[in-house]
Structures are given as structure tokens and as C-alpha cells.
Amino acid sequence: SDQSNDDEIQNFCSDNIFDLKINYFRNKNGRGNAALNTNAAMEICTGEVVKLIYMDDFFYTEDSLQKTYDALINSDKMWLVCGTNHTRDEGKTFDHPIYPRWNDRMLKARGNNTMSGTSVISYRNKNMGVRWDANTFGLLDIDFYHSMMGKYGMCVFLDEILVSQRVNNPDNIISTRSSEQIEKEFEYC
């Protein structure tokens, strides 16, 4: 789901030099709202397993998708989170390995997100009844994890780094918000 103001992403998908099956969708609704954009993308997904990955992130290994699919399909769980790491130099070096773990305090205070960012998530598409809350910004991932846990129970923890996240600052999304805005979002969630 593409909310950009230009055609760069659409052109890339059309050129598709990698022979990938890409379902391109131009989303003009709620421009700039990551939750609404992700929900729009979820609505057009057709696969048995859906792997969310955001445009700043990429697969760490060539078999990341296969490993994700196999682990989820061979479980009785609805969703899965995988390990991740960070890169600050376009994939030349990697640091900050994260192996997600559930933490009941994630929505209590800043710094308690032990699951990591949104690109670690995969889920079974059939009967998926959870969507992202458009009123969240910095906590949208944590809020989604809690919603998934409440509806479907614990996820599969795939203890392997399969996704790399491009970061400039580990808190880059939430750091653009004032302390008051962050506190209001914690209260809301």
C-alpha cells in the first residue's frame, strides 16, 4: 500500500526486474498514517501467510520468507514474530540483535518494547480479525501485539534474525513526539 506523493514506488513495482508478484495499491486515504496504510495493505493480501515488512526494512537472509512460512504453518498459532537487527549504513554492518519476547509491561512505559518493530510480524490470513489502531503513532506496534495476544493468544517466537531494520536513531518514530504526546498515547492504549 503506497501513500507516497510521487510515482517512484509504483514505477519500481511496474519495472519489477526481480520477477516478483507484487500487488501494487495506491492508497490516498489517511496519507501519513501508518496504521491506516497497513490496514489497507492487509485488506488486499491473498496469501495463506502474510509477512508484514516496511519499506525501510529488508529480509536478512535469502530464505527468510520460507522460514517464516514453515514455522507458522507448522504451528497451531495465528501469528509469529522473528528476530531482527539494525543497520545504520544500508546493510554493510549490523548490530542490536533482537529476539522478541512477550512483556506485559510494554504498554506501561517507554523502553519496554521487547518485541521490536512492526516488520517482525507475520500472521495467518484466514479469519484475521485484528487491525491497526489509527489513533496510535509511536505505540502502534505494541498496541497491535496486545490486540493479537488478546484475540489469538501467544505467538510463535522464531528465534532467528530474518529481518533487518534501517535505523538512524533507535527511537526515531517516537522521538518526533513531545513527552506530552507520548504520555497521552500511553494513557490511550
List PLM regions with ranges.
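Glycine-rich, basic loop-to-helix element that forms the pyrophosphate-binding segment
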Residues: 28-45
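Short, high-confidence coil segments that cap the C-terminus of an alpha-helix
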Residues: 47, 75-78, 152-153
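Conserved donor NDP-sugar-binding/catalytic core segment of glycosyltransferases
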Residues: 58, 63-94
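Acidic donor-binding segment of Leloir-type glycosyltransferases
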Residues: 1-26
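Short beta-strand-to-loop acidic/aromatic patch adjacent to the donor-nucleotide binding site
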Residues: 47-58
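Conserved nucleotide-sugar donor-binding catalytic segment
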Residues: 82, 99-181, 185
